[in-house]
């Protein structure tokens, strides 16, 4: 089941599947994982698959929206309407502001994260094998949400929106006042309040990104361990139950990321 003819031990197999296809931003050459690499690298595979899945989402939902009819809907239109209705209901329950951005943002996050997570159900050797033997790639990882750079980048985008809504709804003065005069409303406690509120604010994107990354990385690692440590004829014994259970994790993590985004933006939009 090895994706490379040079891989001879389970340890090498597991390590190989945890390597990203990286581009050295200083030399613009692919990184050789057998040698030390610099900090300035770009995970090409994570970027490619995340953008590809985002484009697939836009294409499918865009075509369904343009071809939507008021009559009896087809299967795809019914499915899209079900997803949109579910997300819209979640937004209405949790966000009570007037912004028209939240519902489309929540829909994009839910479907996009779900599609990225769904890549974890592909056979672990399929795309890496094709990438190596057809395209000559040294490594390939196909689950963008198992890359901490992707999840923290998405969380950073949410953090920027939190700051934007906080300033827009409360003004700069109100936002600064919230950071310096809560929870203790006295000037002497400004340093303490600033530390407490600052940590609380910064912990939101960090926990948001690391939660998704941790769950998807662990799920991917279990699939790799099953493939790397068991004979090919017995892998299905563990693969099938774990894949069925992992479907729940995939959906749940996409839902949690969406819900926390809505909640954080709702909190930022509250006027005190």
UniProtKB/Swiss-Prot annotation:
Any one GO MF annotation of this record: proton-transporting ATP synthase activity, rotational mechanism
Bilayer topology term: Multi-pass membrane protein
One Gene Ontology biological process: proton motive force-driven plasma membrane ATP synthesis
Record's subcellular location: Cell inner membrane
CC terms in the record's Gene Ontology section: plasma membrane; proton-transporting ATP synthase complex
One Pfam family here: ATP-synt_A
Family statement drawn from the similarity comment of this UniProt entry: Belongs to the ATPase A chain family.
Subunit structure: F-type ATPases have 2 components, CF(1) - the catalytic core - and CF(0) - the membrane proton channel. CF(1) has five subunits: alpha(3), beta(3), gamma(1), delta(1), epsilon(1). CF(0) has three main subunits: a(1), b(2) and c(9-12). The alpha and beta chains form an alternating ring which encloses part of the gamma chain. CF(1) is attached to CF(0) by a central stalk formed by the gamma and epsilon chains, while a peripheral stalk is formed by the delta and b chains.
Protein name: ATP synthase subunit a
